Amino acid sequence: NCIKEVLAEYRVPKIGGIPPLTGGFVGYFGYDFVQYCEPSLQFDPTKATDFPDFDLMLFDKIVAFDHLKQKLFIIVNVRTDNLEVNYAKAEREITAVEALLSSSVAQRPFIAAKLGEVKSNQSKDLYAANVQKCKKYIKNGDVFQIVYSQKFTADYDQDLFNAYRILRTTNPSQYMVLMKNDDVEIA
């Protein structure tokens, strides 16, 4: 409900010709967050991840790039409570973003990274056995969907921006994201 209350103050009209995301919350809900939505599920705190259960950031400014059309959008939302003042402020913010984007930035080279030993939280045999259990639960009608995963970890000696750039080049996806804040970095 808290998220809905905040978003109620940020309603924007649909405007043709611009990306559908013009602001709002960006972030993630971790797998362990399900314990708050489905109290009937038993949660084992000893198996919790090191990630926060969720991390949301509220944006009222967006720089979006349409890779298909090779077009950049600078979107600044304007609050309507003091329209003239807020509109002028938004124009200044757009000008500042344009200046920042137009400035010369040194291209960071791809850096050969060293990946440490890849470790899993379970053996291949255990994973396969658990997938079979999941299929049985679905077939029996106990559940209709299971998002079962296997956690892999490895030490990585570069920042994740480098990994993100490599992934974006070798295996692009419309859902790719690089998120970095004080607590966590995800690519």
Name each region found by the language model.
Residues 1-187:
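Extended alpha-helical targeting/anchoring segments
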